[in-house]
Swiss-Prot record:
Protein name: Holliday junction branch migration complex subunit RuvA
GO biological process: DNA recombination; DNA repair
Homology family: Belongs to the RuvA family.
UniProt subcellular location: Cytoplasm
Functional summary from the UniProt entry: The RuvA-RuvB-RuvC complex processes Holliday junction (HJ) DNA during genetic recombination and DNA repair, while the RuvA-RuvB complex plays an important role in the rescue of blocked DNA replication forks via replication fork reversal (RFR). RuvA specifically binds to HJ cruciform DNA, conferring on it an open structure. The RuvB hexamer acts as an ATP-dependent pump, pulling dsDNA into and through the RuvAB complex. HJ branch migration allows RuvC to scan DNA until it finds its consensus sequence, where it cleaves and resolves the cruciform DNA.
Region: Flexible linker, residue numbers: 143-150
InterPro entries: DNA_helicase_Holl-junc_RuvA_I, Hlx-hairpin-Hlx_DNA-bd_motif, NA-bd_OB-fold, RuvA, RuvA_2-like, RuvA_C, RuvA_C_sf
Region ranges (Domain II): 64-142
This protein's record includes keyword DNA damage: yes
One Pfam family recorded for the sequence: RuvA_C
């Protein structure tokens, strides 16, 4: 099983990247926060979760071990596959997902595309006592929610989407910025967001 991959980034796609290692190109599915930091032609080191199914072998990659740890917890829940877990980690920062699970914030979790209320409730029920508290460190309880509901957050997301950036990356970056400072204006979020997305 592949647990770690080090190589050159050949291509960054919508939901994955191609990493060349030992002359072989591996397609690795990654959350938006990881994809946004991969640059074609540059080296990359990814923590890998190798998922084997009847019809395919899939690689999921993360720049940090916290994201991998949370991914493992999410896919351990009945009815939650790797793609849905990746959607959660793309739409919200790791700290916001962890905080949502710890605090039982079903509304926040179900605001992510593809995550219904019942799935969010099941995630909370099964993971509330399993998520390490350090994963939520530094995240105000409303951090993830702020990105999705504040006027500044919504305006910043709309503006960045209009500039052609991908929605999962935009939502992740804006949520991360608002988690650091919930009082930021839309202009500040757009300016800082552009710096992170380019």
């Amino acid at each position: 099983m592949i647990a770690y991959l080090s190589g050159a980034v050949r291509e960054v796609r919508e939901a994955s990247a191609v990493i060349v290692a030992g002359g072989v190109g591996y397609e690795v599915f990654c959350p938006a926060s990881t994809l946004g930091r991969l640059v074609p032609g540059q080296p990359a080191e990814l923590n890998i979760r190798h998922v084997v199914r009847e019809d395919a072998q899939l690689l999921f990659g993360f720049l940090d071990t916290d994201s991998l740890r949370l991914f493992d917890l999410l896919i351990g829940v009945s009815g939650v596959g790797p793609k849905l877990a990746l959607s959660l980690l793309s739409a919200l920062p790791v700290t916001a997902v962890a905080q949502g699970l710890l605090s039982g914030d079903v509304k926040l979790l179900s605001s992510v595309s593809g995550v219904g209320k019942k799935t969010a409730e099941r995630l909370v029920l099964e993971l509330q006592n399993k998520v390490p508290e350090h994963l939520a460190a530094g995240a105000p309880v409303s951090a993830g929610k702020a990105a999705l509901t504040s006027t500044a957050g919504r305006d910043a997301i709309e503006a960045l989407l209009a500039l052609g950036f991908r929605e999962p990356q935009v939502r992740s970056v804006v949520a991360e910025l608002l988690a650091a400072d919930p009082e930021q204006s839309a202009d500040a979020l757009i300016r800082k967001g552009l710096g992170k997305l380019r």
